[in-house]
């Protein structure tokens, strides 16, 4: 969950921030609490449906459907919600067609989260999701060694701006951050 605490602390100390206008939204956060639901569900064949039961990604990314990039999927979900095809500010992640055994074997974590936080068995009912703020592409301005303009104050990891990802960080690129310096 992106809270921005590191950026706030740095800014209060007089450290400049860079490229904070570039924000990535994750397309599958759990309605109500924002828990991030793994994209493995979509990778394993889950559908995104609206309040009408329509697999809406065909309108937005017909070649990729649910496997489109995070920004495309997040915008599509928000469009469906804004145009009245959502329910309570959400669309749905539908795994019912995958079957109970597949869900338990391949997506057990998702099943546990759905049961614990929404009381939903994913093999029986779609789960409400919405785009949620996930990652800020920019961050605390540093040099190549992670030093800021405040002597002795360093920033590293996801709070630091290292200008690697541009406007849209692909899935699993967090690992790239370990190889940046």
Which functions belong to the PLM regions below?
Residues 26-28, 160-173:
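Glycine-rich phosphate/pyrophosphate-binding beta-alpha loops
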Residues 9, 15-121, 172:
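An anion/pyrophosphate-binding glycine-rich loop and adjacent beta-alpha core
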Residues 106-163:
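A glycine-rich dinucleotide-binding beta-alpha-beta segment and adjacent secondary-structure elements
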Residues 5, 19, 50, 143, ...:
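Acidic active-site catalytic centers that drive phospho-/nucleotidyl reactions
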Residues 4-12, 177:
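Short amphipathic alpha-helical face segments that pack within enzyme cores
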Residues 1:
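Glycine-rich beta-alpha-beta "Rossmann" dinucleotide-binding loop(s) and their flanking helix/strand
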Residues 174-181:
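Conserved small/polar residues in nucleotide/adenosyl-binding loops
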Residues 29-34, 135-136, 167:
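Short secondary-structure transition/capping segments
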